[in-house]
UniProtKB/Swiss-Prot annotation:
Ca(2+) binds at residues 356, 408, 417, 451. The lineage of its organism: Eukaryota, Metazoa, Ecdysozoa, Arthropoda, Hexapoda. Its cofactor is Ca(2+); chloride. The gene is AMY1. Residues 17-260 are annotated as: Not found in other alpha-amylases. The active site is at residues 447, 484. Residues 87-116 are annotated as: Disordered. Monomer. Its EC number is 3.2.1.1. One of its GO terms (cellular component) is extracellular region. One of its GO terms (molecular function) is metal ion binding. This is Alpha-amylase I. Disulfide bonds join 286-342, 396-410, 622-628, 693-705. The record marks 552 as: Transition state stabilizer. InterPro entries: A-amylase/branching_C, A-amylase_C, Alpha_amylase, Glyco_hydro_13_cat_dom, Glyco_hydro_b, Glycoside_hydrolase_SF.
Amino acid sequence: MKQLLVILYSALVVTNAQLPGFSFGPSGFGGFSLSNPLFNASFAPANPVDRISDIASRFRDVANNVQRNLPKIPQFTNPLSAFSRFARPTSSSGSTNANSNNNQNFNSNQANEGTSGARNAINEVLNRIPGLSGVPRVPEIPKVPEIPSFGNPSDVFGPFVNSLRNMTNQGINDPGQMFNQVNKFLPDVSRIANSVANYAKSAANSGIWKNISNDIKHEMQNRIESMTQMLSNITSAMKNIAQSLPNLMQDQSLNTTLRNQPFFFPGHSGIVHLFEWKFSDIAEECENVLGPNGYGGVQVSPINEYLVSPSRAWWERYQPISFEIKSRSGNEKQFSDMVKRCMKAGVRIYVDVVVNHMAAPGASAPLYGTAGSTCDPQARDYPGVPFNRSHFHADCQINDYNNATNVRNCELAALPDLDQSNRFVQNKIIQYLNHLLDLGVAGFRMDACKHMRPEDLKSIYVRLKPVNAMFLFPPGARPFIFQEVIDLGTEGVSAKEYTNLGVVTEFNWCIAVGGVFRGTTNADALELLTKNGSAGVLLPSSQALVFVDNHDNQRGHGAGGDSILTYKTKRQYIQAVAFTLATDYGIARVMSSYNFSDPDQGPPQDTVQVIKSPGFAANNSCSNGWVCEHRWPEIRKMIQFKNFVAGSSLDHIQATQNTFAFCRGEKGFIVFNNSENTITQQYHTCLPQGQYCDIISGEVSQSTCTGTVVNVDANGDAEITLPKNSIVAIYVPSRLS
């Protein structure tokens, strides 16, 4: 029985939180009236047990009254966008910010341990309620003498605490939903009040009280008094917030600004596609190369279970069998570790997601996946999800790219075409993507969006969680989404149909830069690939992801054909990548490849088909069959150039048939020669007078330049000699004097 009294005492201690700044008298707030026997009545019973019973009974009545009188909270499609500015980010350990009022150390007595869960839950709610940043939090339970040990108090308070904790967790992700659940929460308050009353009555043994110190009795009486004010003020606060919600909330669920931010850390930019890399190798690359050199993020190849093909071709990753995280790159534990390590290095992770289709039929059935699942594509049977024939579009092949319905409802290369309008299919996709968000990813590359209806993708995107704030994302921010849509302006599906959903891959960029640096197009055409010059030619800059090549078109698949530059034409390829990183248009992605001669060839592997690690060669390039364009000095240093000039204007364009030059404010200058001839010319660099080291031909080492030195005069001009197919890039950090 002593244990029971300690439980009751602990519960009353937990309620000791004052909420100044809210006035809610018996007459109500905003037309809301509340009959309030608990707030205003005096307490007649002198016996503490009777007093507890009385207060519990009144607490129950008030909870029921609040439930009846609280106005219906309106539904909001996406209230988080407006509400998130009030939320407090959490640290990677899950605790609130270190200077928050609730960061107190618990003492080790068992009474404190028994109530710590409730105390944390209540304090977290207070931290999340707008306008209560200065409100004192539930204090530590004072050290109580002569308290015996006791069991788990959750038998009495578990339902209440669990409801509060669940509501808090939901409220962090969706505050509108939290307030809509108030009515569901109040019955738990009523039920626990009944429980308290019943337990209190059973404790009416006067002999028990003789063994409890007077200090505890007085403390319990004081806590009972404060409990009434606690309920009054919390009710007032909830009512106040609930009534103001309609003015705060706006449906911005389809506002593209919520999905076009890649969440690069300060001083970082650019995405690297580490095609077919293992998770453990990606983590090391983040720590050793990407983070230190200012890369912003990594696109990883599809990570969920996919077909095991006889030849282990690269395209097997694009034939999913289930959504279990297990691939040639590693398992879920290794993936989670990679995300955390890359985040600590300042590098974000974006997952390539394949949800347009499932694995295609093979020569026989069943087919086997990388996690051990089997499937029968001919029967449309994928038990690892599970999907069956009802989850797919009718059998047909794409044969008319001018017909959007044919492109979206029929099969791409005999791959069974999922019906994304099917609610079950949507739910499975959303569960998978939300799980990845829980693991800390920053967003997704959505494969084959051209073959899915925008309205179906919209239905999926609006139901995704925010990015996980535990990984240092802004509270409530939506995941970055970049969608593969091949649109060269000649087919029935347009990339512009997808720009209100997120960023779109701009394949016209690949063709344009490839043409210029192959020499088939004049250099002055590069002006069309700047933010100001691209209007009407390319997608708006904020809606475009740009790249020189990707895993498809470097193998002759998709768009571009012979215009596409790859690592196999190194000099021109470096020029194209350097321009992509130096200009002010779009979000840039750099390809990181492995050597191949057969377009179907998979990544480097050992004798048991385990992917080889890239390793480090003497010059910091890759070994074991990997190309690693992102490690090439010219590209690595252009990432640093890009980060330094970020936000500055692109101006003073100086263009001829074979050269193209421009300034990035007064921070940097770059010039390109796309001809087979050496060209010497005077350029305005916009930089202060001095000697500068060209970061393409060399770098600054111990105050000297290992490459070409450019002399800039007092007017900011310089005479520069450009060898054939070359670049000169200088910026403030490369100044020697």
